[in-house]
């Protein structure tokens, strides 16, 4: 995963408009996992790029391709925990993702949450 936005959309093939890879079957694996008996889709990633850039962002970079839609992701995992997304409201998805973001970026993500949802975090 290159980026995951606060709604759970996953960009894995581009950084903004710059293509860096192909889909590589990610969507097939995610949907296959969800469709299997007792299966769930799990996206695992480090919370940052080299400790400097958060992979959990308010919005995907302009021009980024959505590789996996928010409707196909059950869980996002970082070294800070697991964010359950399936069946959650948009507000709860955002809260769950902020909780597994790198601590250095959580305050900024909380500010974006408040702007988007017009309520205190």
Task: Name each region found by the language model.
Residues 1-121:
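Conserved phosphate- and dinucleotide-binding cores of soluble alpha/beta proteins
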